Each structure stands twice: as structure tokens, then as C-alpha cells.
């Protein structure tokens, strides 16, 4: 445990040692925002994976049997679902992302997930299946060999499994049949720039940078997450116009943030996070309750009466151990790294560090947004 604790504190100190490196610097607008209308669209579908070595859906998956019957019907073979018995087929759901500006003939990856009680999709092949958007229209068709990053083998009731063999992917397994139209210019004749992380200061700086690049009055900050830019009237090609916007240089502003992950005990903070004058005194109380059961056997001088019997008597003891709290004092302007170093010196546990950060935030001494995951 001592080695694990030493490793944890080493990692935390490394995080804070490099924190000043990630302070705000000048970046291009394309790293901070996107053009409205340029986005991915989700596609979904349903299909059958065939060629499984007895690891497909069982007869309990009625939807799979009906799907097999429907597929055979397309080839002129009429069978009732009750007449089908196969463990080499699995019903699957298909998901994919249609990228912006996709054209007919482009290939995209397809994720395949089992719907029924199949044990594995290893070695399976997806039959031709359509991929639809939320509007119900078909935008791509998928087919191909399923690649699974795991396996599952069952013999005489013994199962050996690695990762999730019921989920796979078909790289470049779907062909785009139609692309989605991308409207970069709105009905009002403006191009909207959407910030990845809305911030009023950053939005104002982006507006000023665009006006410096394109000319006064071209851009207007609508709110913290949106800047409206006048579309070119004809003197510029739209692509060249957007290129100039995307390559505008901005120094973004960001909120000082401390991120805490309670599950892993990780604490990450930027170099600009400071703490006011604060004194921390954190102690631990350990309560140990133990019970021993003693047998009470009465001594008889003569014949025992009716109310005399052997009984079990519990003997309970409570021990309380309180460790002496060692105070930690930090002066105004101290950083989170200073706090972690001070807590390391008094051998504070990971859980206590998280608790102390929460209390400092409650006391108003932590000038940062505390995010607990």
C-alpha cells in the first residue's frame, strides 16, 4: 500500500508540475470553434451476421428466426420461422457516423452490436443492410467481415472470454449512397461561428480578431457561444473566406478549474488556480466495535428451578482511536501544487485530499470551479 500511495502522489505532483505549460496561448480559431452546419450525422440500421461457428442466436430469439425467414423469402425460399433452427446467425444493430461533406461512394466505418443471445460474432459476415438517419431516409449501405477485438470459447460448460466478443466493427464497411446538404450561410446571409466552450471573453476576442482580418463590422458576438459573420457578397470565394476566418489567431480565456475524479483519486488543476489564506486541520477518528460471546453456566447446589438455564451473554467493547490533526497553513496566492505538496508532507490520504478541496471551495478560499466526476 505504501508503494501505491507513493506512486499516486508522484503522479499528482507531475500533473501540477506541468500545469503552467497548459496556460492560455494564441491559437487558431479552428481549434476553439466550428462553423455552424459542419457536423457529423448519426446513422443506424438492423442486419444479420452470418457464418458464426455455433455462437449465434438461439431459438429463443424469435426476431432472428423471423429475419432469417424474411431474408430467404427474397431469394424465393418460403419457410416458416418455426422451421428454422440455426446457431450460425445473429441479429445485430448497426451504427455509423456520416461525416460532413460526404459524397456518394465514400466509405465509412460501421459498429456492429449483437441484439440477441449470441455468444460471439467472431468470424461473422454482415449481410447487406441499409443505414438510415432520423428522417428515415437511407444514406448508406453496410456489408462485410466483422472484426471483433475479443473471443469467447465454451466447452463442457467452461467458458473462456476476452473483452466483448458480441461487439465488433467493419472498417470502411459502409458505402455512402447520398450526402447531406450542408448550409454554411443562413437565411439571413450570415455565417455563424459556434464556440466549443462558450465564454463571453473569448467570444469578444474572436469577434475582434475576425473584424481585424475581414474588416470592421463584419463580425458580431451574439452571445457567449456564437459569433455571427457577414457572408461574402461576391468579392471572395466562400471557401477562401472561411479559410481566413478559421486561421484568425486568438488568445482564449478560460475559467480556472480543478477536476477531481473520486473513483481513481486523480486531481488535475491548471497553473492559474490560486488559494486565499487558509488553515487546514484534518484529523481521523477510528472506531472499533468488537463483541465476544460468553456462556453463563449456573452452579447448582440442589435441583435447579424452572427459571434457571444456560444463556449466552454478549460482551461488547468499543475502542476509539483519534489521530492528532496536523495543521497546514497556506498564504494568499498559493497554488494547488503548493497545497498538494503540503498535504504530502503530513501523509494525507487520497480520499482526504478530495474532501479538503471540497471544504476549501465551500469556505470560499478556492478561486476555481471544482468539477467532481
Curated annotation (Swiss-Prot):
Disulfide bonds: none annotated. GO terms for molecular function: structural molecule activity. GO terms for biological process: bacterial-type flagellum-dependent cell motility. One of its GO terms (cellular component) is outer membrane-bounded periplasmic space. Pfam families: FlgI. It is found in: Periplasm; Bacterial flagellum basal body. Keywords: Bacterial flagellum, Periplasm, Signal. The keyword Signal applies. Its main location: periplasm. Residues 1-24 form the signal peptide. InterPro entries: Flag_FlgI. The basal body constitutes a major portion of the flagellar organelle and consists of four rings (L,P,S, and M) mounted on a central rod. Belongs to the FlgI family. HAMAP family: FlgI (MF_00416). Assembles around the rod to form the L-ring and probably protects the motor/basal body from shearing forces during rotation. This is Flagellar P-ring protein 1. It comes from Hahella chejuensis (strain KCTC 2396).
